[in-house]
Amino acid sequence: MNMNTTYTDQIYEPGTLPPLGCIPRRMHAWTIRQDRLGDPLTAFRDEIVELPALKPHEVLVANVSVGINYNGIWAARGAPKNVLDANGTYGDDRQSFHICGSEASGIVYATGEAVSNVRVGDPVILSASKYDPDCPWIRSGGLPEYSPTYHMWGYEGNWGAFAQFSKVSDYQCVLKPSELDWDEAAVCCATGTTVNRMLCHWDGNRIRKGDVVLIWGGAGGLGTSAIQQTRAYGGIPIAVVSGTERGAYCKSMGAAGYIDRTRFTHWGSIAGLDEAGMRRWSMQAARFRNEIYEIAGGRINPAIVLEHPGGDTLATSLFVCAPGGMVVLCGATTGYLATVDLRHLWIY
């Protein structure tokens, strides 16, 4: 911890913070435990827990605004991975509880003795990426995401954003630009950077001016960021949503138009469909594609499809994607097992 730091037994109510230099010994946290895994509405509970001790390169941040991601649902359900089983395997002491939350903005309240990039009082954005900076792969210039040490803070790693204070590594802290408010800043590093990587990382399929980009879940966190970033790059964002109210919201964020997926019935696995069933599926998928054409103003297939529903939608994404285009995935919220008709890659 830091010089001139005092500690208090007072527990501060959510929404209030102690003065800088004063650190409570305990805090409110929204936790999950092994015996509550299942329905996220009952798996998460408000508990009073002790604040964690800091190691030399760690930072204690008071959270001002936090984002919600689907990995919190996975953690609460205990599937596809039981994060409580892995609690304590990423350099932290094992705890009987787990604090989720993978994006936040806040204020630095304490630093380990080796921290030099931030200091007490700094407003910061927290990145969810956790890894060992001394990993040979990373030290040789490899992307941290491909390191065997890589994991997600607030999902695999404990002490996430769903608490009054979070413990993070120093490299996770980015100074908050004054142009961003706390809420905008909170969603920059998990949602915002994920979208940017999907649009800009892959050689040969980086977004270009005039590209149609199909965005599943357009009214969600990833979707709203994708709409705005696609517009900023000169692309044409088309959102897929579940209802006209969400569609109107997407248009207010800059979408060229939206497709209401509740008007279609071909979602789910195509495995086992007979010839007649496949014909019906193809007719629905073609009708879905025609709505893209109507919004785009011509027979323009998406150059990029931002996929995260997975099991129910991947076959449609491949069906509508432009030749030479890219379907890029960052999740599987409707199911991990997906089926595709490979003929759509080279025949149709």
Please state what every model-predicted region is.
Residues 194, 221-222, 312-313:
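Hydrophobic/small residue at the entry helix of a nucleotide-binding pocket
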Residues 208, 321-322:
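Helix-to-beta-strand junctions that scaffold the AdoMet/dcAdoMet cofactor pocket
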Residues 91-95, 102, 130-217, 264-269, ...:
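NAD(P)H dinucleotide-binding glycine-rich loop of Rossmann-like/cofactor-binding domains
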Residues 219, 227:
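N-terminal Rossmann NAD(P)H-binding glycine-rich loop of SDR-like oxidoreductase domains
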Residues 232-312:
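Adenosine-nucleotide cofactor-binding segment
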Residues 50-67, 80-139, 177-179:
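Glycine-rich beta-strand-centered segment in the early N-terminal region that forms part
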Residues 217-218, 309:
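NAD(P)H cofactor-binding loop motif with strongest signal on the N-terminal glycine-rich segment
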Residues 323-331, 340-348:
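Rossmann-fold dehydrogenase core element
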